[in-house]
Amino acid sequence: MQAKTVTIKLDKHCYDIIIGPDLIAQAALQIKHSLKQKNFHQMRLAIVTDTNVASLHLDALQAELTKNKIHTFPIIVKAGEQSKSFSTLQVVIDQILAARLERGDCVIAFGGGVIGDLAGFAASMIRRGMNFIQMPTTLLAQIDSSVGGKTGINSRHGKNLIGAFYQPQCVIADTSVLDTLPPREFRAGYAEMVKYGLINQPDFFEWLEKNGQKIFSNGAIRIEAIVRSCQFKATIVARDEYETGERALLNLGHTFGHMLETATAYDSKRLIHGESVAIGMILAHQFSAQLNLVAPTLINRIETHLKAVGLPTQLKDIPGDLPNAETLMALIAQDKKVSQNNLTFILSRGLGQSFIAKNVPPDLVLSFLEQKLTEIR
């Protein structure tokens, strides 16, 4: 099956997202094409990855690069959201500097969203900006986090509060590696795919309702879904690279979702990012319904689809206790969309009719959270 290419055209930078099977075996050619350097074989590549991906795919990638006389330095961190931290960032930076990689060398993010965010942030800072390539290995990273240049780490005050916009030279999305992804991780990525339909693509959401189960099997339908997702995000990012306007729509479900991730201390046994987005999207639509913006039937339809693929949709689906409404509200107040202490949410007026709601009254949000917590206690 031939690889597909989606191009992101920005004001000062243009790069390709290459999507298809068995791309690890073609990595040297793709990297060389993207970096466009005459002394390519003298370059050194730092491969930042995690323990899970390293055990499954690192040998294959290193063998491909070594075969093409490319020097590699693997940097392996612990798998999981807790690696998006200052301490792990320092380890990655220290190892790249210790290897004496130069600005013209390259950092490869070989993993899921955590690795992409972490490695990209490191690349943005080292020598004021190194070459950077994304090689996402999860569905979530292939359709969302590797596309658009957001990098960063978490803080005890909240998720993704420390970071930078730093675009890669290219994104190489090998769809074959998704066959080794645990079902829970694949479902988590699917939540972000559903999000694109709910933002402003009702036809895509309806297509997912018909074809969603096929995406969980490798084949042409899966690749089509990934390509369509990347095309949608590429269009949004091209119009609003630095999230000053419509790119904020991509945060549908994320205000509530990030709140829940922080409240559960980024504990993957309780919640992972895509799951938090699934619950967050339902909460966003329920809050919209409370404001008389959407009909309850739409919420039921979305929830039915998410449940059909095994995603959590309610607070009661999260193991363990949650903080009280006031504590959750304090976490929302740290959301990166907050401006001049005013709350901003992505809400909905119907299927594929999401919008940016500014100056949302805090008392309405607090009352809504209290109601949701009462339902599970």
Swiss-Prot record:
GO cellular component, one term: cytoplasm
Signal peptide start and end residues: none
Known pathway: Metabolic intermediate biosynthesis; chorismate biosynthesis; chorismate from D-erythrose 4-phosphate and phosphoenolpyruvate: step 2/7
Catalytic activity: 7-phospho-2-dehydro-3-deoxy-D-arabino-heptonate = 3-dehydroquinate + phosphate
Cofactor remark: Binds 1 divalent metal cation per subunit. Can use either Co(2+) or Zn(2+).
CDD domains linked to this entry: DHQS
Cofactor(s) required, per the database record: Co(2+); Zn(2+); NAD(+)
GO biological process: amino acid biosynthetic process; aromatic amino acid family biosynthetic process; chorismate biosynthetic process
Gene3D superfamilies listed in its UniProt record: 3.40.50.1970, Dehydroquinate synthase-like - alpha domain
EC number: 4.2.3.4
One GO MF term attached to the UniProt entry: 3-dehydroquinate synthase activity
Residues the record lists as binding NAD(+): G113, V114, I115, G116, D117, T137, T138, K150, K159
Annotated family: Belongs to the sugar phosphate cyclases superfamily. Dehydroquinate synthase family.
Protein's name according to its UniProt entry: 3-dehydroquinate synthase
